[in-house]
């Protein structure tokens, strides 16, 4: 079974943990408890293939940013999360993306831009068009989600698996060649 290393990044309080826990455990975490680093594993089926996702839920707070380079180096796909209710969280994404591209040393990195908390429409300050435009600029997928209302949560991770598969298809294991041996 192929394994996928997915890293969830974004500012503090945008709902990275809520999205991850909703996907992995199907529960919504109501209280905010800043994450240092949590790792989750979940087996899913995407396009008929069994996949093991290893999801790294990272710290959004500044004091843990030194660990980011390591996450980015090992990650195969990235979820960049902002809150539609906080402009500053949207503004932080440019630097995060640049850091990913620098660490990976390529522009072709599987990535999904996620505007979370779409259930809080009345508190929206970041328009959907802004998210779409940034995703176009980043050349990546875009989704608005709600961990609370379970909107598009699974789609984020399935989309990333498909992007990773497209970028680096799994190589079929070749059977070792058998050679004939003659003993005299």
UniProtKB/Swiss-Prot annotation:
Q: Would I find Cell membrane among this entry's keywords? A: yes
The protein's location, in the record's own words, is: Cell membrane
Modification sites for Cysteine methyl ester: 181
Q: Name one GO biological process term.
A: dorsal closure
Note the superkingdom of the native organism. Eukaryota
User: Which InterPro entries does the entry mention?
Assistant: P-loop_NTPase (IPR027417), Rap1 (IPR038851), Small_GTP-bd (IPR005225), Small_GTPase (IPR001806), Small_GTPase_Ras-type (IPR020849)
Q: Name one GO cellular component term.
A: cell leading edge
**Which is one GO molecular function term here?**
GTP binding
Activity modulation comment: Alternates between an inactive form bound to GDP and an active form bound to GTP. Activated by a guanine nucleotide-exchange factor (GEF) and inactivated by a GTPase-activating protein (GAP).
UniProt keyword list:
Cell membrane, GTP-binding, Hydrolase, Lipoprotein, Membrane, Methylation, Nucleotide-binding, Prenylation, Sensory transduction, Vision
The pro-peptide lies at 182-184
Q: Which family does it belong to?
A: Belongs to the small GTPase superfamily. Ras family.
Q: What does this protein do?
A: Ras proteins bind GDP/GTP and possess intrinsic GTPase activity. Plays a role in photoreceptor cell determination.
Q: Which PANTHER family match?
A: RAS, DI-RAS, AND RHEB FAMILY MEMBERS OF SMALL GTPASE SUPERFAMILY
Q: What is this protein called?
A: Ras-related protein Rap1
> From what organism does this protein derive?
Drosophila melanogaster
């Amino acid at each position: 079974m192929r394994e996928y290393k997915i890293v969830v990044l974004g500012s503090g309080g945008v709902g990275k943990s809520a999205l991850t826990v909703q996907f992995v455990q199907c529960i919504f975490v109501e209280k905010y408890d800043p994450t240092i680093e949590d790792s989750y594993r979940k087996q899913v089926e995407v396009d008929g293939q069994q996949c093991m996702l290893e999801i790294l839920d990272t710290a959004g707070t500044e004091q843990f940013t030194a660990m980011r380079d390591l996450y980015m180096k090992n990650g195969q796909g990235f979820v960049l999360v902002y809150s539609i209710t906080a402009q500053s969280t949207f503004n932080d994404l440019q630097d995060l993306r640049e850091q990913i591209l620098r660490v990976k040393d390529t522009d072709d990195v599987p990535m999904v831009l996620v505007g979370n908390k779409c259930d809080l429409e009345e508190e929206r300050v970041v328009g959907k068009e802004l998210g779409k435009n940034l995703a176009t600029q980043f050349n990546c997928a875009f989704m608005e989600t709600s961990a609370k209302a379970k909107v598009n949560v699974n789609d984020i991770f399935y989309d990333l698996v498909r992007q990773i598969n497209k970028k680096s298809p799994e190589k079929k294991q070749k059977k070792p060649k058998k050679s004939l041996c003659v003993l005299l």
